[in-house]
């Protein structure tokens, strides 16, 4: 029995569809498996070389789905020249996470800063609850702009999604500009 789509794949994705009647818990991957399925769908008669290339595929689906939204929230009139340079690099990035590129580091540091700010309530309450995963966080940011937990509780202002995108972007650029001299190589000099 061959599947209708012409291939089988497994990459820690959800093991059932939405018709499964019983509860189960687990942390299932939401990006790599979709990337693998996408590549397999567009390949026609995949060769061993195609499969080797797929194993080394480093396209960031998280970045592809999330970065355009994050960038759309940046108020570039408030940025300094260094921040504008990083913003431009992020706008032109193809979502490939090659080790010799700086842009993936910018994105993942920005994402890390954004997670800290978005889910600050979890850290402040010393709760044992886990923060929502990247997939859920990305969905909330893109689809629930007034979600209560987006607000930074330690400030008097009620922050918006746009605010936390801008704050976390500036935190990221500050991080890279303040790396100790000995930690910088020539590529990290601004």
Regions found by a protein language model. Give the residues of each.
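Structured mid-domain segments that build the active-site/substrate or prosthetic-cofactor binding neighborhood
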Residues: 1-85
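Acidic, low-complexity N-terminal propeptides/linkers enriched in Ser/Thr/Asp/Gly that mediate export
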Residues: 13, 52-190
């Amino acid at each position: 029995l061959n599947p209708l789509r012409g291939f089988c794949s497994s990459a820690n994705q959800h093991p059932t569809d939405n018709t499964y009647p019983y509860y189960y818990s687990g942390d299932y991957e939401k990006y790599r498996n979709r990337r693998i399925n996408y590549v397999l769908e567009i390949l026609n008669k995949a060769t061993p070389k195609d499969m080797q290339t797929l194993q080394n595929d480093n396209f960031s689906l998280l970045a592809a789905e999330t970065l355009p939204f994050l960038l759309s929230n940046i108020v570039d009139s408030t940025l300094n020249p260094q921040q504008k340079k990083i913003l431009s690099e992020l706008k032109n990035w193809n979502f490939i996470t090659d080790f010799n590129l700086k842009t993936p580091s910018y994105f993942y540091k920005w994402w890390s800063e954004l997670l800290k700010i978005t889910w600050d309530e979890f850290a402040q309450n010393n709760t044992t609850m886990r923060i929502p995963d990247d997939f859920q966080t990305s969905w909330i940011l893109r689809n629930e702009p007034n979600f209560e937990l987006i607000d930074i509780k330690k400030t008097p202002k009620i922050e918006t999604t746009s605010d936390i995108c801008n704050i976390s972007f500036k935190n990221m650029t500050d991080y890279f500009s303040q790396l100790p001299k000995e930690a910088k190589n020539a590529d990290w000099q601004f």
